[in-house]
């Protein structure tokens, strides 16, 4: 609410004239690396916009995503980027460009994220998700990594900077593979991204890299035939997702459940995650 008030001064008078009670629920596992906190922040922002009749031109969905990032970073102390704030709003599987957004400038002083939906090219993709059931504050990972990365950017070189550039390459190569329908190559880019994330975390002092449990689930998915698998979220817990070959979703899901059980991950959840074009939706109760 505070973040929205800073950008929508007309909201304060409307809130004084007409109160609101907010209740929330979610089926996103907490601290699982699946944008659970961002989803709730975005839902509340969208509800406030609708309830108080704020302009959906001035406070469009891009602006809501930007305000959500600032709410989490400035109000909640979560060191974070923009992907988790844009994807829930716009939905679909997408290619994102963060050009010009490195320094987290005030709203309006840097570009919005470029969000390119690609779902119409790949509705047949079959993703499987497995959570470790282990909670971790993403900021505890992102804060030292971001500080190190910014220091190397200022210096003009460094190992983390080199790894990040390679990670960017996996994104555009993965996009090309997806558009071509080359799922094997898409899977290779997912795997390569996982290797680079693991290396980045080790560079920043996380001796287990992406995390023992994450590695275990990634291996289980790959051994079951997944074309690619990687963590989602900050690592050291959270979740992984895997790209299953057409018709092989069930065997990958079964393998992930078996691996989680064998590892004693009693709070693990395993489920299919089909690509959907639907993003943020506001529904009014009668």
Identify the role of each PLM range.
Residues 1-7, 21-30:
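Hydrophobic alpha-helical hairpins/lids featuring a short glycine-rich hinge
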Residues 1-16, 53, 66-77, 87-231, ...:
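C-terminal nucleotide
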Residues 19, 235-237:
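Glycine-rich nucleotide-binding loop
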Residues 25-35, 72-78, 159:
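A short glycine/serine-rich beta->alpha loop
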Residues 33, 239-241:
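Short aromatic/hydrophobic contact patches that present stacked aromatics
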Residues 33-55:
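DPxDG-like acidic metal-binding loop motif
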Residues 47, 61-65, 79-83:
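Aromatic- and glycine-enriched pocket-lining scaffold segments that form the walls
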């Amino acid at each position: 609410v505070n973040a929205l008030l800073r950008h929508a001064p007309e909201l304060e008078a409307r809130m004084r004239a007409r109160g609101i009670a907010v209740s929330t629920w979610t089926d996103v596992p907490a601290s699982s690396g699946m944008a659970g906190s961002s989803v709730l922040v975005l839902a509340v922002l969208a509800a406030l916009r609708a309830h108080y009749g704020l302009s959906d031109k001035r406070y469009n969905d891009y602006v809501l995503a930007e305000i959500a990032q600032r709410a989490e970073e400035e109000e909640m102390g979560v060191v974070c980027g923009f992907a988790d704030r844009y994807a829930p709003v716009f939905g679909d599987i997408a290619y994102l460009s963060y050009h010009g957004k490195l320094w987290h400038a005030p709203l309006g002083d840097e570009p919005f994220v470029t969000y390119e939906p690609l779902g119409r090219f790949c509705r047949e993709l079959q993703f499987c998700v497995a959570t470790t059931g282990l909670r971790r504050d993403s900021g505890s990972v992102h804060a030292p990594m971001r500080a190190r990365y910014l220091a190397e950017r200022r210096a003009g070189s460094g190992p983390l900077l080199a790894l990040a550039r390679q990670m960017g390459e996996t994104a555009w190569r993965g996009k090309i593979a997806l558009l071509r329908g080359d799922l094997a190559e898409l899977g290779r880019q997912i795997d390569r991204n996982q290797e680079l994330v693991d290396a980045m975390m080790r560079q920043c002092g996380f001796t287990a890299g992406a995390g023992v449990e994450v590695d275990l689930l990634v291996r289980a998915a790959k051994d079951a035939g997944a074309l690619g698998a990687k963590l989602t979220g900050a690592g050291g817990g959270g979740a992984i997702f895997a790209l299953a070959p057409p018709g092989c979703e069930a065997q990958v899901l079964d393998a992930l459940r078996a691996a989680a059980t064998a590892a004693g991950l009693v709070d693990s959840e395993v489920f299919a995650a089909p690509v959907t074009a639907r993003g943020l939706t506001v529904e009014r109760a009668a």
